[in-house]
């Protein structure tokens, strides 16, 4: 009986998470971006409801989705990529320094 109860609680939690996520409006800008090699690029993401984490994802043409960053506060850096989040302002940015043709991809901001 205990195992069944834990399973049901997990299902309920997943359902509540989906409902909460459905009410959160996420806006990413710019929606399209063209840059010259070597430029500094910024992609912004705003959301309407408090979150536990924000993910920056990348998908190259014909490829799978890759997680770049998971943020709950502050700033993270990996190579030429920098991601920041401001929980109070409900805003995150992804910065690409010294852009390169291999950076051509779809960038996705996802919240939970």
From Swiss-Prot:
Disulphide bond pairs: 45-109
Leader sequence residues: 1-21
Protein keywords: Adaptive immunity, Cell membrane, Disulfide bond, Glycoprotein, Immunity, Immunoglobulin domain, Membrane, Receptor, Signal, T cell receptor
Cell compartment(s), UniProt: Cell membrane
InterPro entries xref list: Ig-like_dom, Ig-like_dom_sf, Ig-like_fold, Ig_V-set, TCR_alpha_variable
Chief location bin: membrane
Entry GO CC: T cell receptor complex
Residue ranges of domain Ig-like in the record: 24-112
GO terms (BP aspect): adaptive immune response
Pfam family, one: V-set
Positions glycosylated per UniProt: 32, 44
Subunit structure: Alpha-beta TR is a heterodimer composed of an alpha and beta chain; disulfide-linked. The alpha-beta TR is associated with the transmembrane signaling CD3 coreceptor proteins to form the TR-CD3 (TcR or TCR). The assembly of alpha-beta TR heterodimers with CD3 occurs in the endoplasmic reticulum where a single alpha-beta TR heterodimer associates with one CD3D-CD3E heterodimer, one CD3G-CD3E heterodimer and one CD247 homodimer forming a stable octameric structure. CD3D-CD3E and CD3G-CD3E heterodimers preferentially associate with TR alpha and TR beta chains, respectively.
Purpose of the protein: V region of the variable domain of T cell receptor (TR) alpha chain that participates in the antigen recognition. Alpha-beta T cell receptors are antigen specific receptors which are essential to the immune response and are present on the cell surface of T lymphocytes. Recognize peptide-major histocompatibility (MH) (pMH) complexes that are displayed by antigen presenting cells (APC), a prerequisite for efficient T cell adaptive immunity against pathogens.
Protein name in the entry: T cell receptor alpha variable 41
Organism annotation: Homo sapiens (Human)
Primary gene name: TRAV41
């Amino acid at each position: 009986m205990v195992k069944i109860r834990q399973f049901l609680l997990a299902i309920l939690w997943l359902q509540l998470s989906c409902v909460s996520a459905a009410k959160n409006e996420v806006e990413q800008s710019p929606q399209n971006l063209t840059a010259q090699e070597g430029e500094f690029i910024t992609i912004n993401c705003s959301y309407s409801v408090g979150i536990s984490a924000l993910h920056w994802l990348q998908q190259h043409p014909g490829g799978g989705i890759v997680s770049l960053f998971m943020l709950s506060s502050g700033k993270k850096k990996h190579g030429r990529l920098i991601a920041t989040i401001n929980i109070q302002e409900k805003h995150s940015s992804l910065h690409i320094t010294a852009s390169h043709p291999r950076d051509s991809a779809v960038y996705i901001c996802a919240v939970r």
